[in-house]
Amino acid sequence: EVWEDVVADIAALVAHPSVADAGKSMPGAPFGATVRDALDCALGIAHRLGYETGDDEGYVGIADIAGELDGHIATIAHVDVVPAGPGWATDPYVMERREGWLLGRGVIDDKGPAVLSLYAGAYLLSRGIKPRYGFRALLGCDEEVGMTDVHHYLESHEQPLFLFTPDAEFPVCNAEKGCFGGMFVSAPIKDGAIESWSGADATNAIPSESVCVLAVPVSELPAPRSHAERLTVEPLGEGRSRIFAKGIGGHASLPQGTVNAIAL
């Protein structure tokens, strides 16, 4: 009976291009204005559904339903997203419904689950059910980059008695596997052939496109060993050339079916 409201709220949240960027930090918005806007949108949904709302200095949104006893159980979702990247057939920030699917950046990861968490708790309110323990829906803002939102939250808030995230198939998936956030840097290569090389927008996304500029004329480039249909070579003049690789992007947690453009 509330499904259309759920879909409308997911669409409202998807409309915010909330890519976390600590370089655009401002008071109350440590990850930039677009993430703050998405957080305010989510908190507005929670308030409308009957939650008591607040936030941890813009790091984490907090939506509470009081319980009979001290302590609370919680869910945690996040309103930040990875960059949309190229290759979309639709506007990634205008949610569309197609053949039973919802299309848009963040529909699955993790704005849709965030909205569903809020509606799950709101069901208790709509039925006049007061839970034994309080229910808290946490709304993170930095899951895709560094999880600094959670660390900040725990500095001044008690841990829930129990918490799970709808950002996976709970309970089969119940923890982060971790990641390596290293950076490989090369010293300048004298007389090197590579002038520039670009590709990825985020460390946890498999890039769909990569571009390399070489100080080598097209006539001297070796023939591709594989995936020739995914490579485009064009001359730039003055003995230079550009190679454009077209892969199949995706989330790094689901590499099956993707083609890493950088590896091409």
Q: What is the predicted role of each segment?
A:
Residues 144, 150-264:
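Midchain, well-structured core segments that form catalytic/ion-binding scaffolds
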Residues 18, 48-56, 97, 194, ...:
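Short secondary-structure junctions
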Residues 11, 43, 115-122, 151, ...:
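Predominant activation on well-ordered alpha-helical scaffold segments within soluble catalytic domains
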Residues 64, 140, 215:
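Short hydrophobic/aromatic beta-strand micro-patches
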Residues 54-57, 104, 137, 164-166, ...:
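General beta-strand structural signal in soluble alpha/beta enzymes
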Residues 70-139, 145:
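Active-site metal-coordination/substrate-binding segment of hydrolases
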Residues 61, 101-102, 241:
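Hydrophobic residues embedded in beta-strands of well-ordered beta-sheets
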